[in-house]
Every structure is written in structure tokens, then in C-alpha cells.
């Protein structure tokens, strides 16, 4: 919807539109984004302004799409651009990833287990936490205890986030403590361990987050969940906080 982008594309020979995170098209996906629904109109507008005889090819990519989401994506482009998509699905199996759930009785034991795992395997590691303050605090505590770590979450300054991400990818430090905000567009091949300090908010998100380990198939990677029964209660509280109230809907409508 940016006029600048519109002008840039009109001045270039576009041979294909490639769309990543395509599950965002579908209301059934865990990351539905309204902005994605403008893409079809944008592509059609470009084709009309260029007076193109043939439609511009479109490719969509996603690592987390149920069958219903796939059908939504195909239906969207069929209706908007009269395009029929062919589906290429890779296997979900990652034989070099080893999954383990470690039961924890309380917060103290969970932190000690985290330290033990980091001591046992020195490698690029992502530790996922459910809240921004938890990510910041864990990174601070780990660094204090001799495990240099940095945090990454949505409330951080953009420059700091970018600096931490780039330093992690470059291998300047090994432990990234992050919320689910970390990962999109990140492709670090040598991550040998992903630890979920808190459970993910969906199975799809968990698969995507754990799948950031072992991108190099020659690496045997570990994926741990440190689970405590209280985590479920906290998880439901977080989910309830994301619900939109009727009053909020009325305010948006106004």
C-alpha cells in the first residue's frame, strides 16, 4: 500500500512475487495478518498498470500450515488473481532433532536444569521464554553465572534487537534468550540446542521454534521443554490477555 514501493516495482521487470510466512493469509493460521490480504489487490494493480498479457507468477512459502490454511491460501489467490497453486510439501520429520520434556517441580529447579543443559553442551543455543521480562531476566542471570547471553523480544529498541540478532548469527555469543518474536528470517545453521523455558502458545509455534535447531542436517541437535504444571495456568492467563473485548471492537469500529 506504499506509493513508493508501487513506483519502484512499476519501474522494474518483475518476474515473480515470492511471499514468505504465507500462513498469515489465513484466519485459521496462528499469525493471521490483515495486511497480507492486500497483496492480491496490489499484484493485480501492478499487472493492470503494466498492461501485462500474462499474470506474474506467485510463490508462497510457509513452514507451519495445516491443510485448512493451505486451502485458504489457494482460495485467496484463485479468487483475487485467478491463479491455481501447485502444492509442494516437504516432510515434517527432522531426524537430527531429538525432543525431550523435562519435568520441573518449581522455578528454582527449572533454572538449575537450564544451567545444567548449557554446561553439558556448549553450542549456539536459543532459550525461549513466554514474556519479555522473563527473557531479559534470564539473560541477565545466565551472564552473571558465567553463561554469556543476550535477550531478544518485541519491546526492545530496534537497534538493540538488530545488534543482538546479528551478533548471535555471527557467533559473537552463544546463548540467545528470546520470546517468540525471535526467529522470523533467522537462518543460523549451527544452532545445536533449543530450550523452551516456558511452553509455546501453540503446537505450530513450538514446531517452528524448535525447528530452528539443526538447520545443518549433519548436526545432532537437542530440543528441550522444561515443563511445570503451573506453566499451563500461566499460559491460559497469557492467552486470555490477547482476547479482544466487545468494547475494544466497538472502539475500532468508531
Describe the function of each predicted region.
Residues 1-254:
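Helicase motor core with emphasis on the C-terminal RecA-like subdomain
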